Regions:
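C-terminal helical cap/extension that packs against the catalytic core
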Residues: 181-191, 296, 304, 348-494
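N-terminal leader/targeting and accessory segments in enzymes
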Residues: 1-27, 31-46, 176
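Extended acidic/charged loop-beta regions that coordinate divalent cations
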Residues: 53, 106-153, 185-222
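Short glycine/serine- and small hydrophobic-enriched flexible loop segments
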Residues: 106-112, 232-240, 512
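Nucleotide phosphate-binding/pyrophosphate-handling subdomain across enzymes
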Residues: 118-121, 130-142, 146-147, 160, ...
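ATP-dependent carboxylate-amine ligase catalytic core
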Residues: 6-18, 42-136, 152-154, 182
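A glycine-rich beta-strand to alpha-helix segment
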Residues: 482-515
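Membrane-proximal helix-turn-helix segments that form the acceptor-binding/catalytic region
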Residues: 162-170
């Protein structure tokens, strides 16, 4: 990474000139960075924010004052960086950076050229070996909540993952972490001690609310309180550093990081911090988009913990909305999972939500590339690292897994009903019908089984077709397609609530299709 940066004309001394907040974590690191950006922007600082992945366009990864750089600026900066790398390729034995490494170098180039006051850098994967870890003198480091993700790269246990995430710690640089499992915190404390980095666990937002009104967060979901609390601490250290105030640094021989900040004096947050938290926006995370007859609930949850949080959020907000609606309401799940993630871990809690239908598709926006919509969205959201066939196989596997779990759930519900009924003749008949209806339907049937309680399932080759079916063709921003038969259970619903989850790339594809709010 250092050599790639140097070939573009960026030295480590240049990187040191950037005033950086560096954030790793499994869940919520992007939201934490977004809160940091909003807080500091509301305090009048010029912010630079490098994030990943993008949802619709790659330029989203580079934000100045909270706004993605323009297409014109992106083009200019891209060719500037690429051209310098291309010119020096021969002397570097043909070496060129991989996709994320290139974007990391480009982000440093942009922030230096734009002369930002603060550069907020979100880690891509892990931390220790991440492309962003060429940063050697950040002002402060943060670690958001940990969970099992990218296990083929980072390891299959929380403590192994914690080792990688703590790899961004730097000597003498204060670091803060959201509350973590004990085994993860053990590893992080050990790494902090080895590196010489003062580590502290952030206090909850409630310590600030004790001296003031409840805080309103611009990103929905109860777990966002952890991310906001971490962001508050990161920004406090950054602003203290900016103003020349001495930041207390706990040595590795002092008390455990688990107790230090819990004893700190609570203070009321400045109005600019409160406003920054309130007006923070981070698309694709607990996001609601309402249209006539349709409400989209979008969350890129892709770990067990984040899916559980997503479900809790969805149940709360969809229930609140349903009280304001009249007529027939149906709920549809649109799902995909990718990479080395265990789909059963993500799908099982979703099965228990009681959706009327579940739709499965790859992160392919359109299956036909000559569409007007495809021409404007396909390049930024295409994944060239996997074949279309493998993506479709994964989709089918996800659907079949959902069906098996749905059948298991339904049988269990009927069994529990039988146990509480003195006269079980009706349930016996229902069970006999169920046993006859649970058959393997290899024709991509629209239903797991034929009885009324069964959830309808359907797989599609692209997001556009999936949304056409899920919305019954009511989504105005999706061009008309060939007729897709809609089952009677969903037909003529007065309102459709659609939860899109399992993959940020899926959420991005949906956002690209349904257009700006």
């Amino acid at each position: 990474m250092i050599k790639f940066a140097e070939r573009v004309g960026i030295t480590l001394d240049d990187v040191d000139k950037l005033s950086i907040i560096h954030v790793s974590g499994t869940k919520g690191k992007g939201s934490t960075c977004a809160f940091c950006e909003s807080i500091l922007r509301h305090q009048g600082y010029k912010t630079g924010f490098f994030s990943s992945p993008h949802l619709v366009e790659v330029r989203e990864r580079f934000r100045i004052n909270g706004i993605p750089i323009t297409r014109e600026k992106f083009t200019n900066y891209f060719w500037d960086v690429f051209g310098k790398l291309e010119k020096t390729k021969e002397s570097a034995d043909g070496a060129m950076p991989a996709y994320f490494a290139f974007l990391t170098v480009m982000s440093l180039h942009i922030f230096l050229k734009e002369e930002v006051d603060v550069a907020i850098m979100e880690v891509g994967i892990g931390g220790q070996y991440d492309s962003t870890n060429l940063i050697r003198k950040p002002v402060v480091c943060g670690v958001s909540s940990l969970g099992l993700d990218h296990t083929s790269i980072l390891g299959d246990t929380i403590d192994k993952i914690a080792w990688h995430k703590a790899g961004i710690f730097k000597p003498g640089t204060p670091a803060f972490t959201s509350p973590q499992p004990d085994n993860a915190l053990d590893v992080m404390e050990e790494r902090a001690s080895e590196i010489g980095c003062p580590l502290s666990v952030t206090p909850p937002l409630s310590v600030y609310e004790s001296n003031g009104p409840p805080l309103n967060l611009g990103i929905a979901g109860h777990k966002q309180r952890h991310n906001a609390a971490l962001a508050v601490q990161l920004c406090k250290v950054w602003t203290d550093h900016r103003r020349g105030n001495r930041v207390r640094q706990k040595s590795s021989k002092e008390e455990s990081c688990r107790t230090e900040l819990s004893n700190m004096e609570a203070s009321r947050l400045p109005p600019t911090v409160i406003e920054g938290l309130k007006h923070c926006r981070w698309d694709g995370r607990n996001q609601t988009i309402k249209k006539p007859g349709i409400t989209y609930y979008l969350d890129g949850a892709h770990t067990l913990e984040s899916v559980e949080q997503c479900i809790q959020w969805f149940k709360t907000v969809s229930s609140e909305e349903s009280k304001q609606l009249s007529g027939r309401l149906v709920q549809v799940l649109v799902f995909n999972s990718t990479g080395d993630r265990e789909a059963n871990v993500l799908i099982e809690p979703l099965v228990n939500c009681g959706f009327d239908a579940a739709v499965f598709c790859p992160n392919i926006v359109l299956s036909t590339l000559n569409s007007v919509v495809a021409r404007s969205t396909k390049t930024d959201v295409m994944n060239l690292t996997v074949t279309k066939e493998s993506q479709l196989n994964r989709v089918l596997a996800n659907m079949l897994l959902f069906e098996r779990l749905a059948i298991k759930r339904l049988k269990q519900q009927i069994h529990e009903t039988e146990m509480t009924q003195s006269d079980s003749s009706c349930s016996d008949a229902k069970r006999r019908k169920m046993d006859g209806d649970f058959i393997d339907k290899g024709d991509n049937s629209q239903s797991v089984c034929d009885i009324e309680d069964c959830v309808i399932t359907k797989d599609f080759p692209c997001i556009s077709s999936a949304l056409t079916w899920a919305t019954q063709g009511k989504e105005p921003n999706i061009s008309s397609q060939s007729f897709i038969e809609i089952p009677s259970k969903l037909r003529n619903a007065d309102h459709i609530q659609i939860l899109v989850t399992g993959s940020l790339h899926l959420v991005g594809g949906v956002l690209g299709l349904i257009g700006p709010e």
